[in-house]
């Protein structure tokens, strides 16, 4: 029941808050919220039965056609920090579906939604709302990296514009210095880890914003843009409106934490962010693998027949 209540609230929050309107929308959105909460409950159970990666692949297939992968994937072993933009909805599912590793943990804010998914709890590094308690998050990440595990971090710490929906915008927000602090901590404690930038796009298909659902152009009504995108998210999770669309995942070069010797946390973070920003240029010069990934690097989210 918690999942249903939370899902319904998330759908309603993108619409007018008048009591009568909200009551009517609650009736309208009840079935989509019920379907979504059912899918998420099944995902939570599947994590225990099938593992996080396979559970994510199966859930992703409920919402998207596939993941189109561009570039060489991460190494199969050794501590790995995956740094990705965060357009929302399917980005985590795309990353999990594409990673060939079973040791993944995701850094995520403490939310009621995640608490309602008990199967996911062991795969999360929760970020407390109280900033004074966040030093433990850095220590938990460092512990996983030292042990050779994979950590997925969204360094902007917030939802960012989808780079395929907004090619006229710079989709990488300012990053947390946690990236640089982790590198310095590893150097001080005598271990190293890989750093893999990633860029995810296409989680919000452009066709969902045609006609009356069109979004304001860059520099226009920012609040209006965010509202229309939140409503599109509702159609994706509640009505599977992106079921025939693919998410694109571009991998950057694999960096190593010990190649940044002598730099400050801010300088390290800036260097890695610059590397990730280079992925934005993939679709702006020459052939466009964002739209036409090479045959060698394109694959479905799952090898299972549909």
What are these regions (language model features)?
Residues 80-132:
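Catalytic core of membrane glycerolipid acyltransferases/transacylases, capturing the structured
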Residues 1-80, 90-94, 101, 303-306:
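Membrane-anchoring hydrophobic helices of lipid-metabolizing enzymes
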Residues 93-94, 117-118, 136-138, 155, ...:
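A short secondary-structure junction signal
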């Amino acid at each position: 029941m918690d999942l249903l209540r939370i899902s319904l609230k998330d759908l309603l929050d993108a619409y007018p808050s008048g009591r009568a309107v909200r009551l009517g929308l609650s009736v309208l959105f009840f079935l989509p919220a019920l379907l979504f909460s059912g899918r998420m409950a099944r995902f939570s159970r599947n994590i225990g039965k099938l593992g996080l990666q396979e559970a994510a692949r199966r859930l992703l297939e409920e919402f998207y056609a596939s993941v189109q992968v561009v570039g060489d994937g991460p190494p199969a072993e050794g501590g790995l920090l995956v740094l990705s933009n965060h357009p929302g909805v399917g980005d985590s599912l795309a990353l999990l579906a594409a990673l060939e590793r079973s040791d993944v943990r995701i850094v995520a804010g403490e939310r009621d939604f995640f608490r309602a998914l008990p199967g996911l709890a062991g795969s999360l590094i929760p970020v407390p709302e109280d900033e004074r308690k966040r030093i433990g998050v850095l220590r938990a990440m460092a512990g996983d990296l030292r042990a050779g595990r994979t950590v997925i971090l969204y360094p902007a710490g917030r939802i960012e514009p989808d780079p395929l929906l907004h090619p006229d915008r710079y989709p990488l927000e300012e990053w947390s210095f946690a990236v640089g602090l982790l590198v310095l901590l590893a150097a001080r404690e005598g271990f190293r880890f890989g750093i893999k930038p990633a860029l995810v796009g296409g989680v919000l298909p452009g066709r969902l914003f045609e006609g009356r659902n069109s979004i304001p152009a860059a520099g226009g009504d920012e609040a209006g843009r965010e509202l229309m995108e939140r409503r599109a998210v509702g159609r994706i999770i509640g009505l599977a409106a992106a079921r025939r669309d693919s998410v694109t995942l571009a991998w950057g070069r694999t960096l190593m934490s010990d190649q940044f010797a002598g730099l400050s946390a801010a300088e390290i973070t800036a260097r890695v962010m610059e590397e990730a920003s280079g992925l934005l240029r993939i679709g702006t010069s020459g052939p466009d693998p964002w739209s036409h990934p090479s045959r060698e690097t394109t694959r479905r989210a799952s090898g299972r027949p549909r």
